[in-house]
C-alpha cells in the first residue's frame, strides 16, 4: 500500500509499504511502524524498528531528533494514538465490516462465552473465529496471545486473517483496558455481550465507577444491532435500561428474556427462550457456567441460528482449557482436581460456593494473587477462600516485580481460620495439596487457568498448573 493512500494526502513521501505494526519487536522488512509513547522510549523503539527493516515511521511526537532517522523517513502525526485502529483497518480493507463481530465484556465469563460462541456457531454451520485470553484463530488452531484484547493494529490484522480463513463471524473478548485505550474503536461490533461487573483492575481504573464506565463503552460508543446482557448484575440492569428494545436479557433469576434453571444436581438445564424451549444435560459444577451459556444461546439464536441445531450441539459442548477443567474425577482412585482461572474475589467466591455444595469430603484450595496488580483485593481473597475451603495452600501467582512472600502475607491477613499453609513454590503447593488429600476430596487450583508461564521479575518461566497436576495425579493412580 502507498503511504499517500493510507493517509489520504499527497503531502507525505511516495512510499510503498507491505505491512503495519505498532510494536517494534513485531516489525518485518518493508513495514510501516506506528510509534506512540514517550519520546525517550520512542527513540529506542524506532531504532529497533529500523533494524528490523521498517521502511517508514509515523510518530505522535514533534520529532525532536529530526524528520529523517538514519535513512528512514519519520513523519509526525499528533493524533496518531487515536487513529491507529483506523489506519490499520484501512490497510486491511476494513475486515470487521465483512464479519459479524461479537464483543464480550464483563469481569468474569468473557473467555467461556467467546469460546463457546466460536465452538457452537462453527458446529451449526457458521465458521467463527475467536480472539481472547486463550489466543486467537479458529478453535483447534489457536495462535498464542499475550493480552486478552490486542493492540489496535493487531486486532485488525487478526480479523483480516480470520476473514481469509473463511470465517463469517468472530467472538472477541473485550477488556476494560482495551475500551479505555481505544484499541477496538475501529472494530464494527454487531452484537455486544455483558456478563457481570465485580472488583478487578482497580490498580488501573482506581474506582469501580471508572471501571464500570469503561465496560459501558461497548454498549454506548458502538452502533450495535443487538446486545445480550445478564441482568443478575445491577450494572447489567442499567445497561439493559439504556439499550431499550435492542437488548436481550438473560440470567438465573428475575425478569429476563429467558431463564436457565439448573436442576438440584446442576446437570440438567431447561432453557426457556423466545425462539423455543429445550433441555440439555451438562457435566458442570457451577451455576455460573450455565449463566455463561445463556449469553451464548442468546447470541446464536438472535443472529438467526436454528433452535433445533443448537439444542443438539449443546450436548457436545467442548471443555474450555483452564476453565473448571477437571484433571481427575471421582471415578479415579485419587482426589478430584480442578483447574480454574478464577482470580477475582467474586469469581473465587462463586467457584468455591458451587464446589462446596457438591463435595462429599474436604475442599482444598491452592491460590495466590498476581503481583503489580490490584493490591486492595488480596485481603478479601484470603477471607473468601478461608471461609469456603477446608484447607488453603497460599502460593505464588505471577509475582512479577513484587516480593511473592509479601503478597502471600497480604492474602493471609484476610484468612479467618488457621487451616492454611504457605509454599512459595507453586509446584510444591500443588503437589502437597493433591498428595495430602483423600479420594473424596476436591482440590481447586485457582488463578492461572490455561496459562503456560509464571512471570517473575520480567522473566516468563515455563509453568502449567494443568501439567503439574497431571504429573502428580499420574503418580497416584
Give the label of every model feature segment:
Residues 1-86, 90, 234, 259-261, ...:
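N-terminal leader/targeting and accessory segments in enzymes
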Residues 1-14, 26-32, 38-44, 82, ...:
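ATP-dependent carboxylate-amine ligase
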Residues 3-4, 63-69, 189-336, 412-416, ...:
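Acidic, Mg2+-coordinating active-site environments of NTP-dependent enzymes
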Residues 17, 30, 54, 71-72, ...:
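Short, well-ordered alpha-helix to beta-strand connector turns
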Residues 55-61, 228-231, 366-367, 391-398:
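Short internal beta-strands
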Residues 60-62, 174, 196, 231, ...:
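Short secondary-structure boundary segments
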Residues 68-79, 143-146, 244-249:
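Active-site regions of enzymes building and remodeling cell-envelope glycoconjugates
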Residues 83-231, 235-246, 358:
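Phosphate-binding loop of NTP-binding sites
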Amino acid at each position: 500500500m502507498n503511504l499517500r493512500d493510507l493517509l489520504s494526502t499527497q503531502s507525505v513521501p511516495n512510499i510503498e509499504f507491505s505491512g503495519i505494526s505498532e510494536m517494534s519487536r513485531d516489525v518485518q522488512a518493508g513495514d510501516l511502524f506506528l510509534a506512540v509513547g514517550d519520546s525517550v522510549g520512542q527513540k529506542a523503539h524506532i531504532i529497533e524498528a529500523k533494524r528490523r527493516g521498517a521502511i517508514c515511521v509515523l510518530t505522535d511526537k514533534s520529532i525532536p531528533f529530526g524528520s529523517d532517522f538514519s535513512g528512514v523517513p519519520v513523519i509526525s502525526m499528533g493524533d496518531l494514538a487515536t487513529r491507529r485502529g483506523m489506519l490499520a483497518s484501512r490497510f486491511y480493507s476494513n475486515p470487521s465490516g465483512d464479519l459479524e463481530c461479537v464483543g464480550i465484556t464483563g469481569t468474569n465469563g468473557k473467555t467461556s462465552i467467546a469460546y463457546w460462541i466460536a465452538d457452537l456457531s462453527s458446529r451449526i454451520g457458521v465458521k467463527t473465529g475467536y480472539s481472547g485470553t486463550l489466543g486467537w484463530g479458529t478453535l483447534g488452531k489457536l495462535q498464542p496471545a499475550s493480552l486478552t484484547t490486542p493492540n489496535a493494529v493487531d486486532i485488525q490484522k487478526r480479523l483480516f486473517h480470520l476473514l481469509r480463513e473463511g470465517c463469517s463471524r468472530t467472538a472477541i473478548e473485550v477488556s476494560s483496558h482495551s475500551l479505555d485505550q481505544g484499541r477496538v474503536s475501529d472494530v464494527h461490533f454487531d452484537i455486544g455481550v455483558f456478563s457481570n461487573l465485580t472488583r478487578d483492575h482497580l490498580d488501573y481504573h482506581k474506582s469501580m465507577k471508572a471501571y464500570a464506565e469503561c465496560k459501558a463503552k461497548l454498549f454506548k460508543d458502538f452502533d450495535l444491532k443487538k446486545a445480550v446482557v445478564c441482568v443478575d448484575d445491577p450494572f447489567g440492569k442499567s445497561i439493559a435500561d439504556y439499550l431499550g428494545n435492542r437488548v436481550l436479557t438473560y440470567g438465573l433469576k428475575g425478569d429476563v428474556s429467558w431463564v436457565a434453571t439448573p436442576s438440584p444436581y446442576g446437570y440438567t438445564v431447561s432453557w426457556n427462550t423466545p425462539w423455543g424451549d429445550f433441555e440439555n444435560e451438562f457435566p458442570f459444577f457451577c451455576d455460573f457456567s450455565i449463566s455463561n451459556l445463556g449469553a451464548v444461546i442468546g447470541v446464536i439464536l438472535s443472529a438467526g441460528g436454528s433452535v433445533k441445531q443448537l439444542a443438539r450441539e449443546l450436548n457436545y459442548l467442548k471443555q474450555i482449557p483452564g476453565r473448571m477443567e477437571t484433571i481427575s474425577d471421582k471415578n479415579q482412585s485419587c482426589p478430584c482436581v480442578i483447574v480454574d482461572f478464577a482470580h477475582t474475589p467474586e469469581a473465587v467466591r462463586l467457584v468455591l460456593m458451587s464446589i462446596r455444595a457438591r463435595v462429599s469430603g474436604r475442599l482444598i484450595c491452592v491460590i495466590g494473587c498476581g503481583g503489580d496488580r490490584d493490591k486492595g483485593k488480596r485481603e478479601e481473597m484470603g477471607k473468601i477462600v478461608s471461609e469456603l475451603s477446608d484447607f488453603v495452600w497460599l502460593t505464588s501467582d505471577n509475582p512479577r516485580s513484587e516480593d511473592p512472600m509479601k503478597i502471600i502475607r497480604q492474602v493471609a491477613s484476610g484468612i479467618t481460620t488457621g487451616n492454611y499453609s504457605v509454599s512459595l513454590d507453586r509446584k510444591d503447593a500443588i503437589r502437597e495439596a493433591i498428595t495430602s488429600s483423600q479420594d473424596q476430596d476436591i482440590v481447586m487450583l485457582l488463578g492461572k487457568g490455561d496459562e503456560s508461564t509464571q512471570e517473575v521479575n520480567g522473566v516468563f518461566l515455563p509453568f502449567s498448573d494443568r501439567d503439574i497436576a497431571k504429573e502428580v495425579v499420574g503418580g497416584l493412580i
